[in-house]
């Protein structure tokens, strides 16, 4: 028996015996060494006997026997002849599965170039030979000769010759030179290359050249040559002389019924190669004419190309049914390829799926499993139990019992299932909460029952969703399922640390109804001794649920030693709240319950319970909340009737007022006072505002009702209208939806996103007329179409994010860095978008936090900021904190726990081995998919907020202006002439309360440093146009303003007023292209006026579309507008813009018209202009002037003589993250990406913690470009992992050498994934062919560091519970080298080894073996 086990062990080589996977080029000898024989014939199997043909593609002599331990002719059968080679048919007697691993080979009659190294760009062969691909192809496909050895002639090595030139040369020099065609020629050239010498010459060239393109080209070649030298690959191996043949069971021939066969495409492709190869051999033996041989060689080359990568060159070879054959390359790439279909995603045994239904009576850790499913899933366990308890003598008998479904089987099943967790999964699994463990409860019926509270995590509903069940088999798997994946351990969301086990819909409505109060309810003013009595009063009908009463409440408060002490008070509350208090756990304050509970408040309840009382109490509490909510929702009897949609009386007045305003604007437009664009914008604004007013009137109407109180006086109270209650509680629906039911539907968007200017004034209760209905359908259908498209987009974004971040794992506790990022509260306008406490909660302080204005340390560095410490920060009004961040973490190939901070899903400092990269990717990707599915909920109703046109402050304080330049107009008001002015309001403690951006041309009512009071308007401007402000007083003089060339004149028919509109450069006649229309200010004598304090003329260049209403020579005063430029109209805000925006940010794409930033600090001036561009010069205090050409149509934010700082805006536009990184550094680019991504999600009301985005940014900043390599192993301009450079620099610092200088580089997530050090991970992501080609040429090693690589080779991942396993492996490797560890393993193969995996006695084993053999005989 022991021998058998040892034999089986030896058979299966474990995945333990390698640590690195190396990929390289195979030499012909290597291919021959893999092979078990040469395949000489294209035949597959004999059509009569169905036995494989000898020497054919399925030959048993080469590849092994077709049946286990049986040779082909049948002379040797059974196990006893193991290892014998039959002398008759030459087949070795062994297991048939060797046909899956034994390879053959084909000796090619003429060499063939490998298409991957030829055609995969950049062509490696072309790069090595320094020849264009086109030329190499001409040689390979026998169109031209190439000179291999010029000898004493005036030809050059590598020169191409046509047929005529070759014949001429032969006449002239006879045998002096050598020129060939075909792969032999290329192989000879590659073989003759001296890599070392070539490298030397290239290095010298690199030193001597100045041209940038040349440098790049040389560096590319140099890298390729060096990689060949280092990897030990020989260039000539890129041309094959021997072709390996895949084992036959990996390209099977399957008999179908009716005597036909289904075959793998590879067999066809191999057959082609063998046929052509044999024909070529014959032709060579016959010494056939050159032209025939050549043609045959070309065909051989083409057939090998098709086998390796069909369709890469020329037309794809197709099979009988006109579809291209699937080549070897197609087998591994794409979604259906080997990597993604079979290695990263496998089908799993012991699993089933079924429809889900509600299980409202379940506990949180339970799910209902249909008996039928359980019986099937736990089959082997049942067999074992039946046998061990003596109900069945053999497995066969047990099987029969289970099939008969004997009564005893059900008892055993219940026993087996007890405390055996199962996993439930709902596709799509967008985050880790999409798979959770539950304890199964056996139920009748065929649907899985799911606990309602976990639906949010699974994003499940019961409209026909299905879920899959998986059974964890081993003890370890069960342990992990119970300890880590149980639904009760996943109360908080990993994305934002808030509870995800939150009641919704019915439960919320029930609790809301139960905790509402009512004026003059039955039994108001009763005095009750406790919650019990309150319930009694309600049940007996003495009091209503909502009546206001006084109740004695006993709270439990923790004392100094952490024990609960009871405290009793008399509290004003309602009957319902008192009843709800009965389920509150000890230690919760009653104040949290003594309010009307909406969805937010309930979420807060659960959160508080978790933070105060821990996991167990919170789970029980959540369950009780759910049961109570369901019960009282049923009691409330809420339902919706058409009468609940109350239309406000004011609606009709508001609409007619709006219609009058629109008519007025229309009149202004017709009299030429406003342009078409301005009119459109203003109309949209009027309707948007009217819609808001109607909605407000409607909500006021719905949300309140007037009742008579006990004193007989009228009093307002919140309404008990069902629709209002549903929306107000957060159970279903929103104000926006009610607005469409009972207000007005409002503005609609066209499918392209532009807004239709006639709104739908009706609502759904009144009903829509045909036109309105038609307009409505636009939005609704667009929503549905978008959803389908965007789901795919979002899934792809998630995939890219996971791929870029998958190898980021917490690998140490503290990296010891003092770096970090500075956090301040996010203030936009008068609102604090995110308070400082919310941003730093769960982070680790990077520096001591001081009390403002003193040196007293509030919190010392390296402290995890939890809720209590955040309260301290709030109380002391700290306004900026430097916290540790993943982006600044110093750990190589991972992150440290301190830089990451709190594990959001658990609430304590994160553990080592946590896969933070994947969690971050899921947290960002998951809402993307959710949001994509939510566009059509508001039915395309345009929510264009009326554009802001003033700043009205909300707090009293001091006004502060930054980046400000202004002129004072004749009324004494300040007019801004600076572009990015920021206006902040500071309170008496020096805290920023409000923050606004104020545009150019705004009129300010207060100067810097003045006191302002709340509600005051401090600035106004026209939101639809941008003025050009005069900075001096004088007379206007037109410059290059020529009618019909640079401008068009528009005269209004009604008023006779004329205005001048500047044409865009692109629309002008050729003569006007170089003209630059401008307004110049001159004094009364016609002399130029200079802007005060500078030597710059007061001349204003007018961009396209600018409108001038002044006449030539008109007088203007300082601060007055000279011209106005209409601004673009608004589109609808919708995540459609959101999802692509997030993708653009993570891909670090350059925007269409990027902002231009100042490269250095200095004084701006303009140099000589070229045709379409102007020359911007920046002169620093010292050093050389920087110059940049800027297209003339770009609007500049700077004037001549202005001082700019490095990184300042010169021309408006979207900023490019690459520029921000280059000019402002890592912190600025992190801030930019984090804030921009958060902006998109915030718009949708999705909370994601900043650190997830930072994790992705860290991965985008993984690479550096070497700027000065000194004498290190790097090349200048090479792209290297930052961690590698840091390691080298540490070593150099110890040796006292100068440190390698580098610049961080920002890569988009796709690029970053493909640039990862692991080629296995990159190949399984995208562009498999390119990645593998590159890796093979460079002889890359994969250290199996990330998660994907380990999944692919079938190991535990180096994260979570697999983290320790990998650490041990590394220790073993360091201690004894790999050899020892394998020996240790083998010496341990004894009793104890077996015992650890499964226990059985020898008798049992033999009995079972005998039974199996019998069964096999029966089968025969």
From Swiss-Prot:
Name of the protein described by the UniProt record: DNA-directed RNA polymerase subunit beta'
UniProt keywords, alphabetically: DNA-directed RNA polymerase, Magnesium, Metal-binding, Nucleotidyltransferase, Transcription, Transferase, Zinc
A GO MF label: DNA-directed RNA polymerase activity
Native organism taxonomy: Bacteria, Pseudomonadati, Pseudomonadota, Gammaproteobacteria, Pasteurellales
Residue sites binding Mg(2+) per the record: 461, 463, 465
Binding site for Zn(2+) 1: 71, 73, 86, 89
KW Magnesium (keyword) present: yes
Single GO BP term: DNA-templated transcription
